[in-house]
Amino acid sequence: MDQILAIRPFVPAKDFDASKRFYRALGFTLTHEDESIAILKLGSFSFILQNFYVKEFAENCMIQLLVRDVDSWWQKTKPGQLVEQFSVGAPREPALQSWGMKVGFIFDPSGVLWHVAEVPF
């Protein structure tokens, strides 16, 4: 059996340049860029931002980012400061959810919802 090295979602971007700036402000590093895609990396994980947008897809796209301490990550990253700069929806601070995980929520400029969750183990 082949060893699986990663799963990288393709994330839509309504405004490709604004989305790249948004993710860099969140701490992602841009590792590749051309006119149709950008690869953004955080730690050892990455995703592919695509210069492609369909409203219904973007607004139903969700990604979960798992961290060891969500409160510490939230305090360090300060996602609330991105609202005015990028005209994104207000983030929801971390709180214990009904499914048992502590999660904060962040919207990107295209409406993609990120669940920033504390690792439960």
Residues of each region from the PLM?
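N-terminal beta-strand motif that seeds the catalytic metal site of vicinal oxygen chelate
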Residues: M1-D17, I63, P120-F121
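Core segments of cupin and vicinal oxygen chelate
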Residues: F10-F47, Y53
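Short acidic/glycine-enriched loop/turn segments that link adjacent beta-strands
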Residues: D34-S36, F57, S98-K102
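Active-site beta-strand termini and strand-to-loop segments that position acidic
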Residues: L40-S44, I106-P109, V119
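Short, charged/polar, Gly/Pro-enriched secondary-structure boundary elements
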Residues: S46-I48, K55-F57, G111-V112
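Conserved beta-strand in the GNAT
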Residues: I48-Q50, F105, H115-A117
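Acetyl-CoA-dependent GNAT
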Residues: F52-Y53, P91, L96-Q97, E118-F121
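Vicinal oxygen chelate
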Residues: I63-L113
